[in-house]
């Protein structure tokens, strides 16, 4: 396959994945926006009640916070809201990851060759939920880890603002920042998993076409990356454990080696 057709095929694969990434981002922004509004209202209401509970001019402390029934009620509400956010993310990602696998698998068509389809829904569900990273965690575990981290850091910011005598407006700003951090982590998980799924789907499609070798193809911009550039056009047996993606937002892919 010459460079022109290789670039076109790589661009086509990336377009399929980018379409699904954009669909996830659109829905994820809605989920985060709703959750953030609910959580911040709870925190702001609790902080204002705390400030109103002490004598005028007195400095509130974290110990005062723990005496408020409102604080413990807020904890339950925030836990419920973040749990719902996690559930929605898991459901959304699971569905779109499956869709992405099928989009890539059936989006690959090699002229002059006949493919024997060997994929089904159960197989795809198994593939997208496989643990493949060195830390031994699945993408869903990372989502729940982030939910727990977010709840902890939101509470930490509340305590810090109380201890430092910050105004409620400063607390709101810090909470918004932490929701932004969580959203970006979720986006990184999405992009990494989509890239991995693209590789798995392509490998299976090539196998079903009877392809013997694949070629690591770095996006034109990625060729300046020392890791991606070093592997550009390196060949592997089809089905080999190729290190893709190499980094977050990696746009490299595997292309079939087809004799002209």
Task: State the predicted function of each range.
Residues 173, 177-260:
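Acidic, glycine-rich two-metal-ion catalytic cores of nucleic acid-processing enzymes
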Residues 1-176, 260:
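N-terminal leader/targeting and assembly helices and adjacent pre-domain segments
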């Amino acid at each position: 396959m010459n460079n022109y057709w290789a670039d076109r095929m790589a661009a086509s694969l990336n377009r399929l994945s980018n379409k699904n990434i954009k669909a996830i981002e659109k829905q994820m922004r809605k989920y985060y926006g709703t959750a953030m509004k609910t959580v911040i209202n709870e925190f702001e209401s609790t902080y204002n009640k705390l400030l109103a509970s002490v004598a005028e001019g007195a400095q509130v402390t974290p110990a005062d916070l723990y005496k408020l029934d409102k604080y413990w009620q807020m904890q339950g509400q925030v836990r419920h809201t973040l749990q719902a956010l996690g559930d929605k993310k898991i459901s959304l990602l699971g569905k779109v990851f499956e869709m992405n696998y099928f989009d890539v698998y059936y989006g690959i068509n090699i002229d002059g060759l006949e493919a024997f389809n060997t994929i089904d829904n159960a197989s795809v569900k198994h593939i997208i939920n496989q643990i493949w990273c060195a830390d031994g965690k699945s993408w869903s575990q990372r989502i729940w880890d982030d939910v727990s981290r977010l709840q902890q850091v939101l509470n930490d910011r509340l305590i810090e603002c109380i201890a430092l005598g910050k105004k409620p407006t400063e607390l709101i700003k810090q909470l918004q920042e932490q929701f932004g951090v969580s959203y970006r982590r979720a986006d990184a998980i999405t992009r990494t998993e989509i890239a991995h799924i693209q590789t798995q789907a392509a490998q299976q499609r090539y196998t079903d076409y009877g392809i013997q070798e694949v070629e690591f193809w770095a996006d034109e911009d990625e060729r300046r990356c020392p890791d991606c550039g070093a592997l550009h056009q390196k060949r592997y047996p089809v089905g080999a454990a190729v290190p893709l993606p190499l980094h977050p937002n990696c746009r490299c892919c595997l292309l079939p080696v087809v004799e002209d």
